[in-house]
């Protein structure tokens, strides 16, 4: 799989804007100099459970299959105890993927593979450096109040904007690996947190149509919604579902589905 085939156009544009921001290169340099990536590796080894062929064999096999399909070097896979369904990937030189216990318990193995493929998409598209950087800046600011809105506000706004767009590229990777129908069901479970939800997996796509009508009803609705998501790390769930529902008709999606 090639990053260029799944990269969302808005992701590619946003990262170029980010790199042109004054002070951004210096932040990247400092982050690499002080090895913030090692902080997260220490957290993983100290508090999470590393998945292998012995402790969770079915999950590990599914993980290896996804990694092979995406075509990246195998990252480390961890499980952490959390009642919220979630997953993340960080690290530039030695990336890792972490899945919450709730996600593994509430989703089918195909749906978990979808989430793993999403995280592998971040690695394939080389998002992990900036993902790690964004998390580090945010956590340092929360802990030590080092970040002032005047100094880092524009950079943070730009980074969050890019991060939301990067999720769309990773979603394409997930849909290409497991199929868009499985992707839609996984997103539905992530949105509601219920493992045995019934009905069509395309419920979020239908809601997306309603949401878009809501935004178009008035300029005030559009302003409210745009301001509300400024510091969101992820696009709203209906927008993610909508984007993949559109992308499933593309030649890139069809090429990868036919080759698997």
Q: Language model features by range: what are they?
A:
Residues 1-93, 156-157, 195, 217-218, ...:
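Hydrophobic or amphipathic, alpha-helical segments that drive membrane association/targeting
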Residues 50, 54, 99-114, 158-164:
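Short pre-active-site segment immediately N-terminal to the catalytic Zn-binding motif
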Residues 54-58, 66, 70, 152-215:
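Short helix/loop segments within enzyme catalytic domains
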Residues 56, 109, 126-127, 163, ...:
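Solvent-exposed, acidic/flexible segments
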Residues 107, 116-125, 169, 173:
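Active-site His/Glu-centered metal-binding helix of metallohydrolases
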Residues 120-139, 181:
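Catalytic Zn2+-binding segment of zinc metalloproteases
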Residues 133-153, 160:
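A structural motif
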Residues 191-260:
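Pan-zinc metallopeptidase signature
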């Amino acid at each position: 799989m090639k990053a260029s085939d799944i990269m969302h156009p808005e992701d590619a544009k946003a990262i170029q804007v980010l790199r042109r921001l004054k002070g951004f290169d210096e932040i990247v340099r400092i982050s690499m100099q002080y090895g913030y990536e090692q902080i997260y590796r220490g957290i993983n080894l100290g508090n999470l459970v590393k998945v292998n062929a012995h402790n969770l064999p079915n999950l590990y096999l599914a993980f290896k299959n996804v990694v092979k399909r995406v075509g990246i070097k195998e990252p480390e896979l961890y499980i952490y105890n959390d009642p919220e369904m979630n997953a993340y990937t960080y690290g530039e030189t030695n990336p890792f993927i972490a899945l919450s216990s709730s996600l593994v318990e509430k989703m089918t193995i195909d749906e978990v593979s979808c989430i793993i493929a999403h995280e592998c998409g971040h690695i394939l598209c080389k998002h992990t450096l900036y993902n790690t950087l964004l998390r580090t800046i945010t956590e340092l600011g929360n802990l030590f109040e080092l970040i002032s809105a005047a100094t880092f506000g524009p950079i943070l706004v730009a980074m969050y904007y890019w991060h939301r767009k990067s999720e769309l590229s990773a979603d394409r990777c997930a849909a290409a690996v497991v199929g868009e129908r499985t992707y839609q069901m996984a997103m539905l479970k992530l949105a509601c947190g219920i493992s045995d939800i019934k009905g069509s997996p395309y419920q979020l796509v239908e809601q997306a149509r309603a949401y878009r009508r809501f935004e178009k009803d008035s300029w005030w609705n559009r302003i409210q919604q745009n301001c509300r998501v400024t510091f969101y790390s992820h696009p709203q769930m209906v927008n993610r579902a909508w984007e993949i529902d559109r992308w499933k008709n593309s030649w890139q999606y069809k090429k990868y589905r036919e080759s698997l």
